[in-house]
């Protein structure tokens, strides 16, 4: 078994693509309008219609499916929810030069929970992990992490 994709429902597709494609450098791989009986059946929403875009990190890995529901209109997450809020809380993007990413995204107005921190123990032998959490435009927590090999 593998993870095929994760899904984020958003309020504004362009604002979200500006974050994931323009700021984070992901590439857009698919763009379609979802509508018809099949989407109504799978979502349980009468007259469901959604704009669907897939993005993917240049380094490969899991795709992100971004949906903006046209009908019914999506409901918002609690703004800037903290990492201890129950439910699916974050996904992680491994980067090189975490400090540069933090500076770049901070300068672009991205909201961070904290600056990068170092995990005080090794999850994998010989690898030190540094990370920070930021919020995407819809409040989804995105972990940026780097693994420093010793």
Regions found by a protein language model. Name each.
Residues 9-61, 125-127:
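Core segments of cupin and vicinal oxygen chelate
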């Amino acid at each position: 078994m593998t993870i095929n994709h994760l899904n984020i429902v958003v309020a504004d597709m362009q604002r979200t693509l500006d974050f994931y494609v323009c700021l984070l450098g992901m590439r857009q791989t698919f763009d379609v309008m979802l509508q018809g009986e099949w989407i109504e059946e799978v979502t349980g929403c009468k007259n469901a219609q959604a704009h669907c875009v897939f993005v993917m990190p240049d380094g490969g890995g899991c795709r992100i499916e971004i949906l903006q529901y046209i009908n019914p209109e999506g409901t918002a997450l609690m703004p800037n929810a903290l990492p201890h809020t129950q439910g699916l809380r974050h996904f992680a993007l491994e980067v090189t030069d975490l400090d540069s990413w933090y500076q770049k995204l901070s300068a672009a107005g991205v909201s961070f929970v904290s600056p990068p921190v170092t995990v005080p123990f090794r999850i994998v032998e010989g690898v030190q992990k540094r990370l920070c959490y930021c919020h995407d435009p819809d409040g989804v927590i995105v972990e940026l992490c780097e693994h420093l090999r010793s």
